[in-house]
A protein has these predicted regions:
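Non-catalytic, compositionally simple segments
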Residues: 15, 57-133
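Glycine-rich nucleotide phosphate-binding loop and flanking beta-alpha elements
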Residues: 36, 54, 84
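Phosphate-binding glycine-rich loops and adjacent basic patches that engage nucleotide phosphates
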Residues: 6-8, 20-28, 54-57, 114-126
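Inter-Walker segment of RecA-like/P-loop motor cores
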Residues: 1-44
């Protein structure tokens, strides 16, 4: 994406393993899913994709601890539901539901959930946009 956009190329350099914002001395890179290799991070933003596939919350905890020195860190988790009710993602989903239902208040967490309504027919393709905008 960076290599084909003149606007992005002016500000960013894309390498094999990362993207660097030269004037900011910042970079974006992917990390291992092995939590033992992530200690010592000093990060401002962490994004976890498909959290339902994480067997433990080890990686998420290491990423959060790597943000403690930052004034306004941002931790973003994106996932589909998954099926494992023993996973940390299931616990997070329960918390998010409580926030969305007004049962729980948490100024540090923003929850957004896309899903069909209970009375929607999942076989009706016109309803799918609700769960996959």
């Amino acid at each position: 994406m960076v290599s084909i956009s003149p606007q992005l190329r002016r500000h960013l350099r894309a390498g094999k393993h990362d993207i660097k914002a030269l004037k900011l001395s910042a970079r974006c890179t992917y990390l291992s899913s092995e939590r033992d290799t992530l200690d010592g991070l000093n990060i401002h933003f962490a994004g976890i994709d498909e959290y339902h596939a994480h067997p433990t919350d080890g990686v998420a905890n290491v990423l959060r601890s790597g943000m403690q020195a930052r004034r306004n860190p941002l931790h973003l988790t994106i996932t589909t539901a998954g099926f494992n009710r023993e996973s940390p993602c299931y616990e997070m989903q329960k918390t998010c539901k409580e926030i969305l239902d007004g049962v729980k208040h948490d100024d540090e967490q923003f929850a957004l959930k896309y899903e069909l309504h209970e009375d929607d027919d999942w076989t009706d393709s016109s309803t799918w946009i609700k769960a996959n905008p």
